[in-house]
């Protein structure tokens, strides 16, 4: 591990010098590439340097404990040594996590698909609330949200919404949101105060570039139709809405939010690429899981991942047993604590798998 860290620190120093080189500074493409590589190593190298500082401090403290004759000073040195050793252990664990192979999709933009499931109007209202929650969280991260396609319900909810979220680390933060989100509450139309249960499905897909997934023109069929609003009524007399069918997989994407057919087609292709890319990623994950003879983090969308219980003012994530009691704040986009808990959990799982594989 430490030989690898030494090599990475040397690479970091090399990149630091390169960023000051006129040859790099005057070439925008080279500078961006070098700066990106430098940024990816910064946290790891800083943590490794902290580790080395702590080991030097421990060496000095041990020497002081061994040589000190004054009882009070010896006790002070021993206390300091214990604290340094505890910090060293924590930093070493951090280094192990930072050395885990990065998910190549972590820095990608994402396509978020939210669909109302069981529960009728109540499910559509909750779908709209979830979309607002992700919007508010995106604002805190300074990400850009753009709706690609949406279908409203007659009560002001959303039957479906597909949006792209653009920003650094979007996939790394929201990739664990895929699955079934269950809501328990008393609908406004309920006269007897009974709690109803509804469900909404969320899918988070890394946006695929054209280099990630190639789609041949012969493999798609594009149909055009008039845009429609809630209830199916036509809202546009021109054929601006598009339906794209990927013939080999029978994957269908519809987009009608823009008045321009060209823009709807562009948005539809972005969604199609993301869905086909996810299929390829899932095939690879399934093959890897089969090889290991165990299912490894499939992110199954049919899995119930979270329950939002309004009468009890709590949110529970069933995968890690994490409960939040400030439901209104959570729905207002304050979801970072849960995101960090999920990230820590799955990093620990990866470490466990890595340790098992080595042994």
UniProtKB/Swiss-Prot annotation:
The entry's keywords: Cytoplasm, Methylation, Protein biosynthesis
Residue(s) carrying N5-methylglutamine: 233
The keyword Cytoplasm appears for this protein: yes
Gene Ontology cellular component terms for the protein in this record: cytoplasm
InterPro entries hit by this protein: PCRF, Pep_chain_release_fac_I, Pep_chain_release_fac_I_sf, Prokaryotic/Mito_RF, RF-1
SMART domains xrefs: PCRF
Gene3D superfamilies (alphabetical): 3.30.160.20, 3.30.70.1660, 6.10.140.1950
Any Pfam family hit: RF-1
UniProt similarity note: Belongs to the prokaryotic/mitochondrial release factor family.
PANTHER family: LD18447P
Role: Peptide chain release factor 1 directs the termination of translation in response to the peptide chain termination codons UAG and UAA.
Name this polypeptide is given: Peptide chain release factor 1
Originating organism: Koribacter versatilis (strain Ellin345)
Lineage: Bacteria, Pseudomonadati, Acidobacteriota, Terriglobia, Terriglobales
